Amino acid sequence: MTDILVSKIRNFCIIAHIDHGKSTLADRLLQDTGTVQQRDMQEQFLDSMDLERERGITIKLQAARMKYKADDSQEYVLNLIDTPGHVDFSYEVSRSLQACEGALLVVDASQGVEAQTLANVYLALENNLEIIPVLNKVDLPGADAEKIKQEIEEIIGLDTSNAINCSAKTGVGIKDILEAIVRRVPAPQDEIKLPTKALIFDSYYDPYRGVIVYFRVISGSLNKREKILLMASKKNYELDEIGIMAPDQQQVDELHAGEVGYLAASIKSVADARVGDTITLLNSPANDPLPGYKTANPMVFCGLFPTDADQFPDLRVSLEKLQLSDAALKYEPETSSAMGFGFRCGFLGLLHMEIVQERLEREYDLDLIVTAPSVIYKVNLNQQEHIFIDNPSTIPDPQLRESIEEPYVKMEIYAPNEFNGTLMGLCQERRGVFIDMKYITTDRVTLIYEIPLAEVVTDFFDQMKSRTQGYASMEYHLIGYRKNDLVRLDVLINSERADPLTSIVHKDKAYGIGRSLVEKLKELIPKQQFKIPIQASIGSRIIASESISALRKDVLSKCYGGDISRKKKLLKKQAKGKKRMKAMGKVEVPQEAFMAVLKLNQ
């Protein structure tokens, strides 16, 4: 393997918004360079998870090595490092960009530049990548390549005079892209003589070999059977195998600076080999790790409960297995009077949450109830102390706290300007603070808002898409905590608090939400032998209340005529029984009721 000159290596990635044809383009590159034979080809070859193919998104990174004979009759090695395009996975994107020297910026010629593309382009520019603009889907009837080129120049400031028009589906322009990669993407720096450093840009769990780590050698070289040290986790391992992805794994004896490969070293869990960590040699380690490593912190939390209590052990095992391949997933056990045993889980964002839930249901065959998503609140206690809380039901009572702060995000929404009004309306409904509005082109606008994260994690994305016919796109990042007039809204069923329905809401919205919650529960909870009050409360103050009337059993049906005192005695006995029942009786809330209420727009 070492006969490859560093000057003949090109490491690049593809930046694109969801649905702009990134995976199809990757397939076409693999096919045209002969890396994957026609008969083995399947659509979206690099998206190995069924879920990725179905949703058409890239979740876990993949990498592939291609050999390409260029027009100058030299053979080059092209390493394609795949990146996820979704905002939840932006840290993973930033790491894979650090492993590259160039990027293909793929823009749909019929749709134009979208928010997440922009966010990733700025990351690429920060890493000094050579960016090659590619206009995909030029074969579509609605494609307007010239207009989109102008848009790229105006929005991003990239020179598009040598942008490439292509159609990944029909294969037009693929040769031009390969030539552009060879000519325009710089070769890696030749740092074979320096101490070994390699950047982990992805890892996944293999049940037979332990964690498989994808890495890019930045300096020095790695040999089979060497002992390695991971600088952030301070753990050391002996290499079992190293190799390249072509795109199936092939073992090699050595990889040197500039090359991209995989390693297996009997690593037990993905958390030990975090994305962004630096690999070095145990016997002659590098002095300092590569910059930019950070652990991904969850931003969105929810409770996961099995619908069948017997499945709790299975849920625990499945979460343990999932965590082996998803280091960003955090969980801890939680119990609830209404739902039984379950787990409180933390995720990077809403998409991450949906994917984990779907993988649990699909790969591990579980049936789950998911409580409403919440964020981490900062609760300032009276004694100048503060605590962070991710579960609304554990927030202290009003007399024990001074204020609640919630996380805010800075959000940029890109949309055609005819949707300006509806989007501003949506942001105002969600307590957004207007910051700025920029016209990027004559018919597209950027709205910048600062908005509470709690308002974004519910259904903001769906609402934004439906109000703009799918044309708007957004991206956001955390900007810190702010004090707000927030209250804990509890739901009491027969004077008992139902934890899964507790939420943190703004005081102005509390009445409306409380009202709709109790009305919905009244429809869904079946009648009992006694009257059930359903109340929404803030602290000790009831703000909305409904009651479910009792079922009436006719105790007088056996008395035909006869003395009135006999009837009175029976009625009195019934009233006494009902009183006792009300004091002792537990209301079984059906799970459908919880499901429906959780679906109620937050």
UniProtKB/Swiss-Prot annotation:
NCBIfam families xref list: lepA (TIGR01393), small_GTP (TIGR00231)
Its EC number(s): 3.6.5.n1
Family: Belongs to the TRAFAC class translation factor GTPase superfamily. Classic translation factor GTPase family. LepA subfamily.
Naturally occurring in which organism (per UniProt): Prochlorococcus marinus (strain MIT 9312)
Limits of the tr-type G domain: 7-189
Primary role: Required for accurate and efficient protein synthesis under certain stress conditions. May act as a fidelity factor of the translation reaction, by catalyzing a one-codon backward translocation of tRNAs on improperly translocated ribosomes. Back-translocation proceeds from a post-translocation (POST) complex to a pre-translocation (PRE) complex, thus giving elongation factor G a second chance to translocate the tRNAs correctly. Binds to ribosomes in a GTP-dependent manner.
Pfam families recorded: EFG_C (PF00679), GTP_EFTU (PF00009), GTP_EFTU_D2 (PF03144), LepA_C (PF06421)
Binding-site list for GTP: D19, H20, G21, K22, S23, T24, N136, K137, V138, D139
UniProt keyword list: Cell inner membrane, Cell membrane, GTP-binding, Hydrolase, Membrane, Nucleotide-binding, Protein biosynthesis
Location in or out of the cell: Cell inner membrane
SMART domains (alphabetical): EFG_C (SM00838)
Topological category with respect to the lipid bilayer: Peripheral membrane protein
Organism taxonomic ancestry: Bacteria, Bacillati, Cyanobacteriota, Cyanophyceae, Synechococcales
Zinc listed as a keyword: no
Gene it is expressed from: lepA
GO cellular component, one term: plasma membrane
Cited PROSITE patterns: G_TR_1 (PS00301), G_TR_2 (PS51722)
Catalytic activity from the UniProt record: GTP + H2O = GDP + phosphate + H(+)
Signal peptide: none
Gene3D superfamilies membership: 3.30.70.240, Elongation factor 4, C-terminal domain (3.30.70.2570), Elongation Factor G (Translational Gtpase), domain 3 (3.30.70.870), P-loop containing nucleotide triphosphate hydrolases (3.40.50.300), Translation factors (2.40.30.10)
Top-level taxonomic group: Bacteria
GO BP: positive regulation of translation; translation
Protein name, per record: Elongation factor 4
One Gene Ontology term of the molecular function aspect: GTPase activity
InterPro entries reported for this sequence: EF-4 (IPR006297), EFG_III/V (IPR035647), EFG_V-like (IPR000640), EFTu-like_2 (IPR004161), G_TR_CS (IPR031157), GUFP (IPR027518), LepA_C_sf (IPR038363), LepA_CTD (IPR013842)
Coarse class of the protein's main subcellular location: membrane
